[in-house]
């Protein structure tokens, strides 16, 4: 199935895009009518035996899901099969959600409404239509859990299901990808795609052709993680900032030696700081040609690590290692690193042995990875707020699915204070007051440091709270399962993707009625996040499936989102006796600050996307070329044409019955090696360009246009250089000495490789200009 071309982001208003991002009532009504029509087939499905049910499913014609008359029968059969195999009978709203995913939408379905089952039904529909489905999760735990949970349903209707985690072997992966439905984390799917770019035999390929991606927690994967590069690295020696520079930067003064911007995204030396560094390094000129790409880069990297990256906010230190914290999930970002020496600089700052970065052999962003699929759909509890990005970058619509039972959660207005200190005092007092009643409380904080500070204050005030953050995320399922227990107070960092429902009365619901009488779970937010979605994810933990619940957020004018996006001089300052601001404008001001923050994030996404788009296009050309070399006689034919005398010499020297096959293998190895070598060198060149491209603005050049010009020119040379190098190797390689074979020492590949994710810095704000890629390979 061909894929609809995706256009570049426009400049239309947020409200306009968000409206476009939502599917129309007409579409929802059509799907609802099909759910209603399924009722006519329920008795018929219930009367079928298990084998008859499986056979009936196989007879359905779902090849054109948008115009199939068999959809109501499919819904009736899958509902019956689900109840028999899992004990779960899908509600109408779950069937509706599945249909909207089968229509290619991202659905918004509230926490606790059964997204996992709806996703399995949608996956079944695609698979029965002959499609291969990847259910993409945010971590390995959910991939395996959901595959094992939903597997009996899929198998009951004649489908095969598999799952992949980091521990899966190559054989496990090939078997799982061979199933009709495969559950895997976005990381593992991406790493398999990258690792396939090192194979030299087509039989060693693991990752299949991308067909359908059904994405759980779609906003987290498609928006929050969109620009995270997945990296395949090989062992090599790379320079990191010198220890003397890291130590020197640590001694600089914030008052005089360096400045940061208002939202702490950038830091730079002042003239005073530059002179101090130059003197300490022996009187050098940091901005001379000799040092601008070396010493100055080391200083800037060390400065970034020392000033902008804060322990227990951006990272934690555990088991003598630096672990990045995913800001949108509040968890350790597994396998994630900072690029270009920054990881080593942070490790040196913390007195930890620096780890190897290696040479980047291949890389792909999550956004480019997902855009490979012919069909993309998904589910999340907060899709509408991400509708703008889903529309712009993936051309996806959003379908809001009503809850099975109306939501009765009481969401109170924000309580706003002038200072963070006053806000924190009010939070502690509020939590102590609620705890006295026995009502369970879930507190959402914005980072690890804040969660631990609040936890300590609560303990001092006699409130027996538990804390869940990136430092103890291995225990999260147990903590969250008991967060609805009578008297429980749970302090947690961001709740996105926690994957465990909070049941009133605890995991066994023994105190359910008592907690219901108290008002259900009470959610407290310690401040607005940079996007409305994260606030809604936290609120959504209360009021599950019609349960009572409540939420309230505390904010202050000193909070990051407000301080960076509102003029403090124009904010109301009159307070009541408790220090709470008295003004009808507070909610509107907070909403405005959040919208500004969201707009900035969208700009960052769009601008970074414009750089990554070219790299993704170039990578696609490399992949096509590599696949041609792997699966055909292209390499042998090209080298025979380029070096006919050498080819004939080798053909005559080798046994006639094996000459062609032997030469095909040899030519393929040579061509693949030099193609891969050229691509790795090209990626290193692009990384170097990106480090200094912003300086082009000083010369009144467009950084983006310059990046495109340099990248396109270099890529055009890559093809010619790779083929020329392959020809030279073919003509000089030791092929005839001893047993016929290639001297592999001349084609040495990395002795070890590993995969990781890069927490990459956003690039400058530029306007996208038209670009074109030459047909660099024949």
UniProtKB/Swiss-Prot annotation:
Record flagged with keyword Transmembrane: no
UniProt keywords, alphabetically: ATP-binding, Cell membrane, Cytoplasm, Membrane, Nucleotide-binding, Protein transport, Translocase, Translocation, Transport
Catalytic activity, reaction form: ATP + H2O + cellular proteinSide 1 = ADP + phosphate + cellular proteinSide 2
One BP term from GO: protein transport by the Sec complex
Binding site for ATP: 94, 112-116, 501
GO terms, molecular function: ATP binding; protein-exporting ATPase activity
Membrane topology: Peripheral membrane protein
EC number: 7.4.2.8
Subcellular location as annotated: Cell membrane; Cytoplasm
Presence of keyword Nucleotide-binding: yes
GO cellular component, one term: cytosol
Main location: membrane
Coiled coil residues, start to end: none
Gene3D superfamilies per the UniProt record, alphabetical: Helical scaffold and wing domains of SecA, P-loop containing nucleotide triphosphate hydrolases, SecA, preprotein cross-linking domain
Family: Belongs to the SecA family.
HAMAP family in UniProt: SecA
UniProt function note: Part of the Sec protein translocase complex. Interacts with the SecYEG preprotein conducting channel. Has a central role in coupling the hydrolysis of ATP to the transfer of proteins into and across the cell membrane, serving as an ATP-driven molecular motor driving the stepwise translocation of polypeptide chains across the membrane.
Subunit comment: Monomer and homodimer. Part of the essential Sec protein translocation apparatus which comprises SecA, SecYEG and auxiliary proteins SecDF. Other proteins may also be involved.
Stated name of the protein: Protein translocase subunit SecA 2
Species, as recorded: Mycobacterium leprae (strain TN)
Gene responsible for this protein: secA2
């Amino acid at each position: 199935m061909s894929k609809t071309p995706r256009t570049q982001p426009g400049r239309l208003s947020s409200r306009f895009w968000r409206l476009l991002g939502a599917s129309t009532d007409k579409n929802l009504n059509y799907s609802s009518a099909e759910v209603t029509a399924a009722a006519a087939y329920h008795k018929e499905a219930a009367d079928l035996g298990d084998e008859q049910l499986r056979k009936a499913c196989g007879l359905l014609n779902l090849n054109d899901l948008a115009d199939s008359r068999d959809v109501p029968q499919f819904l009736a059969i899958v509902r019956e099969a689900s109840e028999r195999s899992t004990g779960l009978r899908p509600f109408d709203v779950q069937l509706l959600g599945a249909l909207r995913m089968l229509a290619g939408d991202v659905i918004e379905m509230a926490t606790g409404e059964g997204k996992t089952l709806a996703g399995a039904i949608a996956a079944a529909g695609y698979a029965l239509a002959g499609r291969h489905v990847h259910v993409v999760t945010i971590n390995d735990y959910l991939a395996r859990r959901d595959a094992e949970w939903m597997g009996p349903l899929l198998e009951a209707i004649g489908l095969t299901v598999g799952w992949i985690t980091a521990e899966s072997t190559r054989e496990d992966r090939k078997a799982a990808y061979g199933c009709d439905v495969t559950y895997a984390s976005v990381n593992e799917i991406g790493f398999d795609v990258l690792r396939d770019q090192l194979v030299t035999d087509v039989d060693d390929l693991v990752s299949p052709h991308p067909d359908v991606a059904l994405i759980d927690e779609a906003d987290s994967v498609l928006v929050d993680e969109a620009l995270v590069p997945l990296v395949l690295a090989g062992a090599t020696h790379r320079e990191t900032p010198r220890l003397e520079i890291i130590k020197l930067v640590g001694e600089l003064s914030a008052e005089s030696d360096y400045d940061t911007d208002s939202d702490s995204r950038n830091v730079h030396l002042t003239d005073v700081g530059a002179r101090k560094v130059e003197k300490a390094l022996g009187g050098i000129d940091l901005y001379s040609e000799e040092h601008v790409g070396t010493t100055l880069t080391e200083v800037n990297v060390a400065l970034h690590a020392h000033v902008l990256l804060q322990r227990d906010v951006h990272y934690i230190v555990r088991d003598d290692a630096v672990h990045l914290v995913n800001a949108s999930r509040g968890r350790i970002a597994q396998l994630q690193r900072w690029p270009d020496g920054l990881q080593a600089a942070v490790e040196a700052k913390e007195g930890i042995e620096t780890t190897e970065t290696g040479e980047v052999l291949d890389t792909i962003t999550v956004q480019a990875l997902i855009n490979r699929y012919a069909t993309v759909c998904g589910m999340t509890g907060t899709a509408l707020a991400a509708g703008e990005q889903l529309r712009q970058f993936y051309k996806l619509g959003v379908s809001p699915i009503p809850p099975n039972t109306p939501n009765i959660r009481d969401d109170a207005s924000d309580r706003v204070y002038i200072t963070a200190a006053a806000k924190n005092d009010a939070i502690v007092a509020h939590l102590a007051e609620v705890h006295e009643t026995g009502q369970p409380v879930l507190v959402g904080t914005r980072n690890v440091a804040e969660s631990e500070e609040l936890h300590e204050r609560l303990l001092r005030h006699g409130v027996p709270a538990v804390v869940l953050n990136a430092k103890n995320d291995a225990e999260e399922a147990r903590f969250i399962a008991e967060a609805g227990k009578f008297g429980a107070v749970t302090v947690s960092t961001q709740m996105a993707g926690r994957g465990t429902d909070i049941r009133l009365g605890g995991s066994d619901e023994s105190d359910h009625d008592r907690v219901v009488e108290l008002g259900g779970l009470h959610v407290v937010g310690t401040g607005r996040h940079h996007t409305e979605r994260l606030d809604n994810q936290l609120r959504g933990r209360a009021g599950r499936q019609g349960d009572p619940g409540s939420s309230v957020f505390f904010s202050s004018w000193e909070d990051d989102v407000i301080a960076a996006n509102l003029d403090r001089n124009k904010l109301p300052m009159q307070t009541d006796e408790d220090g709470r601001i008295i003004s009808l404008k507070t909610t509107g001001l907070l909403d405005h600050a959040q919208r500004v923050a969201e707009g900035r994030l969208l700009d960052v996404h769009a601008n970074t996307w414009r750089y990554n788009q070219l790299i993704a296009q170039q990578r696609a050309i490399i992949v096509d070329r590599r696949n041609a070399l792997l699966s055909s006689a292209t390499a042998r034919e090209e080298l025979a044409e380029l070096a006919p005398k050498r080819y004939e010499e080798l053909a005559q020297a080798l046994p006639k019955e094996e000459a062609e096959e032997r030469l095909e293998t040899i030519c393929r190895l040579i061509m693949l090696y030099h193609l891969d070598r050229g691509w790795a060198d090209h990626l290193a060149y692009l990384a170097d360009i990106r480090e200094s491209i912003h300086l082009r603005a000083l010369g009144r050049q467009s950084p983006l246009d310059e990046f495109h010009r340099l990248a396109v020119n270099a890529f055009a040379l890559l093809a010619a250089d790779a083929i020329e190098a392959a020809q030279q190797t073919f003509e000089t390689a030791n092929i005839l000495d001893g047993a016929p074979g290639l001297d592999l020492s001349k084609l040495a590949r990395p002795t070890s490789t590993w995969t990781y994710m890069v927490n990459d810095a956003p690039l400058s704000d530029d306007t996208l200009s038209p670009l074109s890629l030459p047909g660099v390979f024949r």
